[in-house]
Structures are given as C-alpha cells and as structure tokens.
Amino acid sequence: MQMKNGWTRGQFRIFRVTFGIYLLYHFLSLLPWGPELFSSQGVLSQGTMSPLFHLFPNLFLLWDSPLFVQACLLAAAIFSLLLTFGKFDRVMAVMVWYVWASLYGRNPLIGNPSLPFIGWILLAYALIPSLSARDELSSTSEDTGFWRMPADIFAAAWILMALTYSYSGYCKLISPSWMDGTALHHVLSNPLARDTVVRTSLLALPAWSLKAATWSALFLELAFAPLALIRRLRPLLWVAMVGLHLGLLVLVNFSDLTIGMLILHFFTFDPAWIPSPEPVGQSIFYDGHCGLCHGLVRFILNEDHSAHPFSFAPLQGEEVKRSIAESVRAELPDSVVVVDENKNVLTRSAAVIYVLKRLGGLWFLGATLLSLVPRTLRDLAYDGVASVRKRIFGRTEEVCPLVPRQLRARFLH
C-alpha cells in the first residue's frame, strides 16, 4: 500500500526542526532524574529486573552507573540538536533511537503510549531520502531536485497510527468507566489534571455532557482504522484526534505523552490537504546580483510542484520591461517583485505572502499567519532584510541561478 502525499523538502524541514526540539527537550528534562530512573543506584538497581532488558544489545548492559547514564542523556541531547540543524540527521536519528530504546529497555516503568511511536519515527526518518542530498539545484543534474516523502513510509505511519487507535478503543471496551461514560470525569478529577478555569467549567457541566464526550472519544478511536480507509475522511479524522490531544494538553499535566502523540500527527499530516490556487501566468522578478534572491528562486523551484508553476526573470533583464510599465518600474524595490495572474504588481511583504499562499501546505498556513501582522510592520521587516542582504548573503555575477536543464524553461528571457 502506498499513499501519495504533499510533503516537500522545505516543509519536511519544519517537521525535522520541531521533532529535534522535542527530542532535545525530552532528554534535557530527563537529565536531573536519569540516575534515579536508569542507573544501578535508582529505582531498578539491576537491569535484569526489566523484562525488556535483554531484547537487544542494550546500552546499559555492561555499565549503568549514574555518571554513565547522565553522559548518555547528554549525548542524546547533542544528537537531537544535530538532527534539528540537519547535521548527519539520518545517522543522528539512529543514534537517538538507540539511546531511546535502551532507556525504555532499562526501565519500562517510564513507558507511555507515545514512546513506541517516537522510536518508530526515528527509524523511519533514517530511511527517508536525505533533505540535503540535492539541496542546491545543479545546472548539470538531470534530476529536478524535487524531494518527496516516500509513499510507502507515509502509508506505514498511517496504518500504524490507525490500527493503534482502534486497538486502544477496543481495549477500552472492558473498562467500566469508559462503558458507563464517566472516564472524562475521572480524568478531570485526577491529581494530574491542571487546576484551571477550563477544568472547573467542565466539571460544572451536566453529567450527560461529559458522558457524551467520553463516548464520542471512544467511538472516534474504535472507528479510526475503518474510517481511515476512506481517503476523504482522513483529514477530518486527523483534525479530530489532534483536537482531542490538544484538549488533553490543556487539561492534564502529562505533556510528554501528549506532545509525543502530536509529533506523530505532524508526521502523518499531508500538506496536500491545504491545496494552493493554481492561476496561470504569474511571474517573479528578482535581483539577479543578490545571493539571497538566488536562494529564494531555488527555494521556490524546490517547493512549487504545481501544474502552472511560477516563471522567473531578473530585474536587470528585458522581460521586466515588457511586463511592467516604465512608470511602475520606477517605484519598484530592487529585490523581489511578483506579477500575479491579473497583472497586479506586488512588492515587499505582499509579494512574500502571495508566493507562500501559492505554494500551499504549511506555507499557506504561514502566509495566513503573516497576513495578520499589520502591513507597515511586515514591510519594515522586509526592508530591513533587503538593506543588508548583499552584505550578508553576497553578490552574484550571473543573473540566473544554476538550475537543472529541465527547469531552465521556467526562466523568461
């Protein structure tokens, strides 16, 4: 089974950074408790007390002193940081997985439902094509440089998630509190529940409403796997479960579980669920002697896989004279200018927002958030970057970036 998806190189980098920060926080938060949880002087003084200890060559088989445990946690934090910045990221994913699995094998009492998912994602990450292998589009490459999330890995993640949710719901059928609808009330009354206005307000609701919420959550879990077979229902199921986990994050002080599950949902998110409009005839004019502008062009080439992609031309070329009236050109900035499908000329932050919305997926969400910022502030930030771009990113002699032969038709002359 394969599932096509809309992940692109740039969007998956956002996942990588988010994932890496989560792992870094996880290991750093464990540092003060490491000796108590995993060492020979902790709650399980002997590793053999764990039924999982000998399932594979555990890191702590030969040595589990408090100092060694903390050194391993610190090393895992460093590996996570390197993964965050994309340095040997696939190797770092395997290294983090090994520490992750060893810690769980040494003390399974730390377990929560998200830990196996995170371990699986680490291994899956190691099998995903490198995000940097063709990061710079080469003029001699026959490949367009387009990166894609492998469809079989994406499908495997969805199958694993769907079956686990439905199995979790099935197991809840033998729980009296889930069957009589009082499970949510018990969660809100639990010592781990956050003492907030939201919790107090929910406890004040009629008993039937909490029961309805409990049974709705149970039905969602039970039906997740069969309903996920229907492609059009997957976004709705995904959003419903994310909403459920966000609710738990607000209500219950067990963030390590909830954030881990949200990481799984981020991995199974399909950017194609947020399609971009595909107008015809939009062009981007850029400063041909600006290193940052060349980088922007390469970024858009990597991210724009639409049927009617952007065309490009340098501001120093002849195409800009044919496309934009002289009276308008006199007022244009010398960085990036967009001419949309209606021949409107967009500059500064308006041009950035248009391009991001046009790329769809996570970029569309980012553009939507950016559009909430007053334009005066957006343009001020844009002008600040534009004023120092050549000092920081350098100048280029060639007005067109180096790109594969197949992409050269995207450049207007």
Q: Where do the language-model regions lie?
A:
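Alpha-helical membrane-anchoring segments
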Residues: M1-Y286, G291-E303, F310-E318
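Thiol/selenol-based redox catalytic cores and closely related redox-interacting motifs
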Residues: G317-H413
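Short cysteine/histidine-rich zinc-coordinating motifs and their immediately flanking basic loops
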Residues: N302-S306, F411-H413
